[in-house]
């Protein structure tokens, strides 16, 4: 994923800057998550004596022991949930180690790329102390904060404390367009304005992720490490193509998952669904969309040759990573790991129903047995006349937005739909008006088939209260304010 691509790229770029060339291995989906014996064998054939894992490895006991027996020193740089025991290797750098001090609680929120950046800072300080830079320039670590920001936002870790500082400064670095890979990807996505956390999470991130989902897993990391514009443009073009394919596959799997969930009883406060030969590259995205649709923790799995691979996304109140680790320790899963809001796992098909019961009962204990009613928290109420570029500028001072610091959700009261139509991939475009005069453009993304979209399309002229966010939209060099609709109710 993006956290893995950015953390491995950052480490590779730093090592290159101090004269050490380090090949990067990003596992293809068929190889499975985390380090594998195949990868260890490939590195051993190159004469490798130091193996570093990023964004994985904390619970990879067998493979890391295998690497040790091949004569390698091993270091893990990770942020996923740990077990009571740790691999017997040189170092496990992970703020979620169970023996880790609580002196700096904000470190427990770090993405893997944040862990790698702090490791690089510490190594750089030690090199300076030992006189390594007496006859060579020290690298400018700040220039890599764009990678730190990208991985942090895309891994949906809370944007609090150090993470907030990383993203705020990283966005400034990204606006300089120094990384030719990110520059090429932004150009491919027609992103010419100053980037925000929205662009990281919903424009650049999905394209980098697409390689690992439906194409070649290493493409994203290769792009971020690209050293010339031609190579970067070629890789950006490939990722854009992978992303288009990913959208098609995702729509198909999502439709099937919804049909299954709404056609069968769901006895627990979870959305638990599986299908045969669903593309494993999109099940994580589908889990996220099911979580949003039903307001429940979502488990989505693909069954292939009696083996099941799954992905889960959670809601506040349920640590999904801890659930997966508990199921693994109980013997229900063959592999698994994650953090508060997301997890991945594997199991045998014969254990599917046992895992459903375990996950459902675990969720019941955490969330209660009462039916979860999805709620939409509103931060403020405005009228149409207040939806101005100046007000949007003031809201942007609260950036970066993301997990732990969500974009302010506003209720736009007393408006009517003047015009509405469907554009793009099922988006509903509107022009809003008020009885006091004035107009405002609005968009409800991927809403054409939803109840909200149907209301916007079929009830023109009627009064509505709309919930959503106010953003500035730049197109062809022209900036306007736009309301992004999440929900609607009759006024």
PLM regions: where:
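Histidine-centered active-site/metal-ligand motif
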Residues: 79-80, 95, 279, 339, ...
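Mid-to-C-terminal polyanion-binding domains and interfaces
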Residues: 231-237, 241-273, 326-491
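Active-site cavity-forming subdomains of large catalytic enzyme subunits
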Residues: 41-133
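Structural signal for conserved beta-strand scaffold positions within catalytic alpha/beta enzyme cores
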Residues: 24, 76, 92-94, 149, ...
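Short alpha-helical basic/polar micro-motif
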Residues: 114, 284, 288, 466
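Flexible glycine-/small-residue-rich
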Residues: 26, 54, 76, 94-95, ...
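Hydrophobic helix-and-loop "lid/oligomerization" segment in the mid-to-C-terminal part
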Residues: 1-50, 70-71, 88, 125-357, ...
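A short acidic, often aromatic-flanked loop/helix-cap motif at beta-alpha or helix-coil junctions
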Residues: 31-32, 98-103, 385-387
